[in-house]
UniProtKB/Swiss-Prot annotation:
<feature type="topological domain" description="Cytoplasmic">
    <location>
        <begin position="82"/>
        <end position="333"/>
    </location>
</feature>
<feature type="domain" description="RCK C-terminal">
    <location>
        <begin position="246"/>
        <end position="331"/>
    </location>
</feature>
<dbReference type="GO" id="GO:0005267">
    <property type="term" value="F:potassium channel activity"/>
</dbReference>
<feature type="topological domain" description="Cytoplasmic">
    <location>
        <begin position="1"/>
        <end position="6"/>
    </location>
</feature>
<dbReference type="InterPro" id="IPR013099">
    <property type="entry name" value="K_chnl_dom"/>
</dbReference>
<keyword id="KW-0812">Transmembrane</keyword>
<dbReference type="Pfam" id="PF02080">
    <property type="entry name" value="TrkA_C"/>
</dbReference>
<dbReference type="GO" id="GO:0005886">
    <property type="term" value="C:plasma membrane"/>
</dbReference>
<feature type="short sequence motif" description="Selectivity filter">
    <location>
        <begin position="46"/>
        <end position="51"/>
    </location>
</feature>
<keyword id="KW-1133">Transmembrane helix</keyword>
<protein>
    <recommendedName>
        <fullName>Potassium channel protein 1</fullName>
    </recommendedName>
</protein>
<keyword id="KW-0407">Ion channel</keyword>
<dbReference type="Pfam" id="PF07885">
    <property type="entry name" value="Ion_trans_2"/>
</dbReference>
<feature type="topological domain" description="Extracellular">
    <location>
        <begin position="28"/>
        <end position="60"/>
    </location>
</feature>
<keyword id="KW-0406">Ion transport</keyword>
<dbReference type="InterPro" id="IPR003148">
    <property type="entry name" value="RCK_N"/>
</dbReference>
<keyword id="KW-0472">Membrane</keyword>
Length: 333
């Protein structure tokens, strides 16, 4: 239980004790509410004016019990309040409140489960692309260190396998989730939980063992990745064709921020049009890499490729070109 939660609990207990004692004094002593309430407050504060004292046996007995319980509750609460300020919880509390306010405003964001080596790289890439994201990790110290370096990060301390934690990250409004915690079993469980809470969310999950890849897909992951396989394949490509790989990397890492994106054709004006007559290249400047029709993907589509509503277009270009393409194929002015 967090310190501020202990303070809230202590205050609630104190208020309940005061109200209960007030009712008892009204009942056994016959006092009006204000007199009973006043006496209860004075007693628990240990001021002890002595202007009102119970005369009945039950009244005196209730005050004895009340004093022990009340003084204990006050001491507990004051101790936590002191700890709240002395141990730096005050700053942490308001940082948490501010962060939760930012999370409430999130929409169409990504959730990164696990802030280890992979999680940090993913977060850096998202920051470069100005993509909103939330980090979930159970290591509080790790996230505090990350926030010291970058106060703009949005982090949640907790177990990503917990539905409550995923709900805190607004999973119902999230666009995607990336599960890169250290345990394959946890990645499978996170995938299952995420799909249950948001069936439409796009999930990429990490597998330490190649044998886990199929399990992640069956659990609901849209993509399952084994870093060792991907890393090994990349190293092999670099060794075999260093010039080609370097060229591809230079394209992606240019100052113009070249990217590859996918869009669904929604513009009715493009329905049943040939690619060469669509005006995509002329109006946007983006290059079409592939067109996906149902389960069939046409790579390097020829000019006579027919475009239909619902087709998925994979395109390459600058951010500005791709934004123009997005507006054009989706029919947004």
């Amino acid at each position: 239980m967090e310190t501020y939660e202990k303070i809230e609990l202590g205050i609630i207990v104190i208020i309940l004790l005061i109200l209960i004692e007030s009712v008892i004094l009204m009942t056994v002593e016959g006092w009006d509410f204000f007199t009973a309430f006043y006496t209860a407050v004075v007693t628990i504060s240990t001021v002890g004016y002595g202007d009102y004292t119970p005369q009945t046996f039950l009244g005196k007995l209730s005050v004895i019990i009340y004093i022990f319980a009340g003084v204990g509750a006050v001491a507990y609460t004051m101790g936590n309040i002191a700890s709240f300020f002395i141990e730096g919880h005050f700053r942490k509390y308001f940082r948490l409140r501010k962060m939760m306010d930012r999370i409430k405003k999130l929409n169409n964001h990504y959730i990164i489960c696990g802030y280890g080596r992979l999680g940090k790289v993913i977060a850096e890439e998202f920051k470069k692309c100005n993509i909103p994201f939330v980090i979930i990790d159970s290591d509080e110290k790790l996230l505090e260190e990350a926030l010291e370096k970058d106060p703009n990060l949005i982090c949640i301390v907790g177990d990503a396998t917990s539905d409550d934690i995923l709900k805190k990250a607004k999973i119902e409004k999230a666009k995607g989730l990336i599960s890169v915690v250290s345990s394959d079993a946890e990645n499978v469980f996170i995938t299952l939980s995420a799909k249950k809470l948001n069936p439409n969310i796009y999930i990429v999950a990490k597998a330490e063992k190649p044998s886990t890849l199929d399990k992640l897909i069956k659990a609901g992951a849209d993509r399952a990745v084994c870093p060792y396989i991907v890393g090994g394949m990349e190293i092999a490509r670099i060794a075999i064709n260093p010039d080609i790989v370097e060229f591809i990397h230079s394209l992606v890492a240019t100052e113009e921020d070249m990217e590859v994106r996918r869009y669904i054709v929604k513009n009715k004006e493009l329905d049943n049009k040939l690619l060469k007559d669509s005006g995509i290249r002329e109006k946007t400047g983006a290059t079409i890499l592939a067109v996906k029709k149902g389960d069939k993907t046409i790579t390097s589509p020829p000019p006579d490729t027919v475009i239909n509503i619902g087709d998925i277009i994979y395109a390459f270009g600058t951010k500005e070109q791709l934004e123009k393409l997005k507006r054009y194929v989706e029919g947004v002015e």
